[in-house]
């Protein structure tokens, strides 16, 4: 099952996506500029193979809900995210707000 939910963070619009699969869930929160995602995101692939695309993304591990994804510290971020001031260790929520600038 796929669930798309509009959410607001400090008055800014985002879309939360949850994909329920057998034995696992994929979760992401996105806007037009970038996204954060659960541990399934391969940041190394985005940085190495797709660097020219400038994908703004961050990865949080060990999360099971959208709220946990928003509150969890990012374990890794893309080079393009770093260029916006998004850093490893900041919360998903904080990273998303930096994507608004």
UniProtKB/Swiss-Prot annotation:
Pfam families in the cross-refs: DUF1805
| Xref: InterPro entries | DUF1805, YunC_sf
SUPFAM superfamilies xref list: Hypothetical protein Ta1206
Which species is the source of this protein?
A: Bacillus subtilis (strain 168)
Name of this chain's protein: Uncharacterized protein YunC
Domain of life the protein comes from: Bacteria
């Amino acid at each position: 099952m796929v669930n798309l939910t509009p959410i607001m963070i400090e008055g800014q619009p985002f879309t939360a996506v949850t994909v329920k699969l057998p034995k696992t869930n994929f979760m992401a929160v996105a806007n037009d500029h970038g996204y954060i995602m659960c541990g399934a995101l391969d940041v190394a692939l985005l940085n190495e193979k797709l660097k020219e695309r400038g994908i703004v993304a961050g990865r949080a591990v060990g999360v099971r809900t959208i709220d946990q994804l928003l509150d969890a510290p990012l374990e890794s971020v893309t080079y393009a995210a770093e260029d916006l001031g998004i850093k490893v260790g900041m919360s998903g929520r904080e990273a998303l707000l930096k994507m608004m600038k």
